[in-house]
């Protein structure tokens, strides 16, 4: 359990074996993010299409930074994989460039991951005086904050889990929703996500309709993931989406108010538009890279977009899909293998070795 007592010597050792991994493109708020990292951990920046201003900021930054870069702009899964391959640290703490850590959070999350392989902190969503900013904060709280999941940030995990969840950190094909797919494999392996509510990060306020662009991209990722079989596909898509959206909007109105539910309805439209856009146009040109085993995993009761919790039937269907793709993901019977006294020396998995060579 993450609440088990851990000595300070073990925590210091854990900090020395931790890397904060941040995917970065053109967000200059990365300066505030780095400034909030109040421990001597490795800081890994995984660049994907960086702007000149970002490159200048990195070159002039006083703290040591490990920098890697991918050509696939906007591919968060590939960026995180490159970041993981660029470091040999045992514990990977995923963070976003538009967020900052509260004091002491890095240490708290390292302490927790020493006795729990995956630990999730809490996001505090900022808001401005604008109505859309306030509604965005309420919707984000509802959509990501009312259940425990492996959606990042902030998320820290022991890289030893990778060999137990299919041999890879994140799916590079789906571009978006990469943390959602990661969460599904954790459930297949029976690896729990421990929630640490006191580990708070602050998300910068979002303005205008920027959040709709994010949900559109999530929809594209959903479309790719359904085609490759790492997400389930509803057997009757239109009816399922109508049912799932109606139920979710009722819950949103109950928990966050009618205004938030109305805005969430627009986000749902953006999400499903993104899925249709992928079906028609393949905007990331990924279909040529699908494995030969790629096929839809159809179910009558598909996985809701709002939650990552899998039913027993959904677990069986996804386990079968991974097995058909050549990945056997079995339940881990002894989680103590991930404890700091049993982890052994820090080292990368075979998948990490391959990605390091690619980098």
Please give the residue ranges for each predicted region.
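Short, well-formed alpha-helical segments that are part of the catalytic scaffolds
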Residues: 26-39
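A conserved acidic beta->alpha catalytic loop
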Residues: 47-56, 96-100
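Glycine-rich, basic loop-to-helix element that forms the pyrophosphate-binding segment
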Residues: 70-87
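Short aromatic/hydrophobic "clamp" motif used to bind/position activated sugar donors
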Residues: 92
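Conserved donor NDP-sugar-binding/catalytic core segment of glycosyltransferases
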Residues: 104-131
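Acidic donor-binding loop at a coil-to-helix junction in glycosyltransferase catalytic cores
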Residues: 175-182
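Active-site donor/metal-binding and catalytic loop motifs
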Residues: 195-213, 222-226
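Non-catalytic, C-terminal membrane-associated alpha-helical segments of glycosyltransferases
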Residues: 214-221, 231-359
């Amino acid at each position: 359990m993450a609440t088990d007592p851990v000595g300070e010597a073990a925590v210091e050792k854990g900090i020395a074996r931790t890397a904060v991994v941040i995917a970065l493109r053109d967000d200059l708020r990365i300066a505030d993010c780095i400034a909030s990292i109040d421990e001597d951990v490795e800081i890994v920046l995984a660049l994907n299409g960086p702007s000149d201003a970002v490159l200048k900021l990195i070159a002039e930054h006083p703290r040591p930074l490990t920098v890697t870069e991918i050509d696939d702009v906007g591919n968060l899964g590939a960026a995180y994989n490159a970041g993981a391959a660029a470091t040999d640290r045992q514990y990977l703490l995923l963070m976003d460039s538009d967020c900052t850590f509260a004091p002491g959070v890095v240490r708290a999350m390292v302490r927790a991951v020493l006795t729990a392989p995956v630990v999730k902190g809490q996001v505090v969503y900022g808001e401005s005086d604008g109505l859309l900013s306030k509604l965005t904060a309420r919707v984000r709280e509802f959509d990501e904050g009312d259940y425990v999941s492996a959606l990042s940030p902030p998320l820290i995990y022991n890289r030893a889990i990778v060999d137990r969840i299919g041999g890879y950190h994140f799916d590079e094909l789906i571009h978006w929703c990469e943390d959602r797919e990661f969460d599904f494999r954790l459930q297949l392996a029976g690896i729990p996500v421990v929630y640490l509510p006191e580990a708070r990060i602050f998300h910068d306020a979002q303005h205008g309709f920027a959040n709709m662009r994010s949900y559109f991209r999530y929809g594209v990722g959903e479309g790719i993931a359904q085609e490759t079989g790492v997400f389930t596909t509803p057997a009757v898509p239109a009816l399922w989406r109508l049912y799932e959206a109606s139920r979710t909007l009722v819950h949103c109105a109950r928990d966050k108010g009618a205004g938030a539910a109305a805005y969430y309805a627009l986000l749902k439209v953006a999400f499903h538009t993104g899925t249709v856009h992928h079906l028609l146009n393949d905007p990331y040109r990924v279909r040529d890279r699908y494995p030969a085993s790629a096929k839809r995993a159809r179910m009558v009761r598909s996985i809701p977009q709002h939650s990552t919790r899998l039913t027993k039937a959904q677990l069986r269907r996804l386990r079968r899909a991974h097995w058909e793709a050549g990945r056997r993901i079995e339940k881990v019977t002894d989680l103590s293998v991930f404890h700091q006294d049993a982890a052994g020396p820090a080292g990368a998995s075979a998948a990490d070795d391959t990605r390091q060579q690619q980098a």
